[in-house]
Swiss-Prot record:
The modification Sulfotyrosine is found at Y4, Y7. This is C5a anaphylatoxin chemotactic receptor 1. It comes from Macaca mulatta. Residues 3-11 are annotated as: Required for CHIPS binding. The modification Phosphoserine is found at S307, S310, S320, S325, S327, S331. It is found in: Cell membrane; Cytoplasmic vesicle.
């Protein structure tokens, strides 16, 4: 029986797919996925719960706190859904949660995963504007605009999730007996490919380009001013962009390939076996980015001396960036005054 119990838009129910006689044993990719899910759940739930607590109750009501609060909420909800993924894989992709849950729960997982990606791109764009257009930021950058940007990111994530909600169904198998949850596009291959292309462009290529462009220009500006040529800035830039690319690339590439393959082809079946592992890989990115900012933004001895909540408050407050923006604004105004 084919493994259609995963939780992404790549799942396709096709009665003509050959029977997989090894479905009664967990494959190596599934075992690796279970290990990754367990680690991400334990680390991600605790870390994101702490970030939510700090940003909501302890940190100053800064714009950075708004960004990271939304990002942590998305990551936290994604991590809470991991026991569902874990249970289904352990049961050889059997779906015991019913038809309504088949539509809602996997769609919520996708919603939160895409929201995390788009919020990360929004944070990067905000930092870009803060450095390159500080006067505009002083005049217009506020909490209200930040919440609007977050709402747009959540709304776009919702649009990316709609195909999963509309076309997800359950189907009963008999050899061996199990219930499968997957996306059924029927015989309309063009619709399936359109969904895959939209997911690739809006959920991967555009956020990746945003991250790369913003951090590249920020790095060039930092070097041109000779402000901080330490490896700290470079580590943050490389780590954020590289982690995004590494963890999401397998999920997106396999999804695109499967949308153009026949379900009965050997390549499709091979990619299906790797599906759980690709999803678990993408999940790692949902809990790693704030860790990158904390670890790369503090020296090792400083991290030892400070408590984790204190480190988070340090990262989430904007005092250093605000001082830099104000300093740059004053120098710009003074230069303009001298010219006039």
């Amino acid at each position: 029986t084919p493994d259609y119990g995963h939780y992404d838009d790549k799942d396709t129910l096709d009665a003509n797919t050959p029977v997989d006689k090894t479905s009664n044993t967990l494959r190596v990719p599934d075992i690796l996925a279970l290990v990754i899910f367990a680690v991400v759940f334990l680390v991600g739930v605790l870390r994101n719960a702490l970030v939510v607590w700090v940003t909501a109750f302890e940190a100053k009501r800064t714009i950075n706190a708004i960004w990271f609060l939304n990002l942590a909420v998305a990551d936290f909800l994604s991590c809470l859904a991991l026991p569902i993924l874990f249970t289904s894989i352990v049961q050889h992709h059997h779906w015991p949660f019913g038809g309504a849950a088949c539509r809602i729960l996997p769609s919520l997982i996708l919603l939160n995963m895409y929201a995390s990606i788009l919020l990360l791109a929004t944070i990067s764009a905000d930092r870009f504007l803060l450095v390159f257009n500080p006067i505009w930021c002083q005049n217009f950058r506020g909490a209200g605009l930040a919440w609007i940007a977050c709402a747009v990111a959540w709304g776009l994530a919702l649009l990316l999730t709609i195909p999963s909600f509309l076309y997800r169904v359950v189907r009963e198998e008999y050899f061996p007996p199990k219930v499968l949850c997957g996306v059924d596009h029927g015989h309309d291959k063009r619709r399936e490919r359109a969904v895959a292309i939209a997911r690739l462009v809006l959920g991967f290529v555009w956020p990746l380009l945003t991250l790369t462009m913003c951090y590249t220009f920020l790095l060039l500006r930092t070097w041109s001013r000779r402000a901080t040529r330490s490896t700290k800035t470079l580590k943050v830039v490389v780590a954020v962009v590289a982690s995004f690319f590494i963890f999401w690339l397998p999920y997106q590439v396999t999804g695109m390939m499967m949308s153009f393959l026949e379900p009965s082809s050997p390549t499709f079946l091979l990619l299906k076996k790797l599906d759980s592992l690709c999803i678990s890989f993408a999940y790692i990115n949902c809990c790693i980015n704030p860790i990158i900012y904390v670890v790369a933004g503090q020296g090792f001895q400083g991290r030892l001396r400070k408590s984790l909540p204190s480190l988070l408050r340090n990262v989430l407050t904007e005092e250093s960036m605000v001082r830099e923006s104000k300093s740059f604004t004053r120098s710009t105004v003074d230069t303009m005054a001298q010219k006039t």
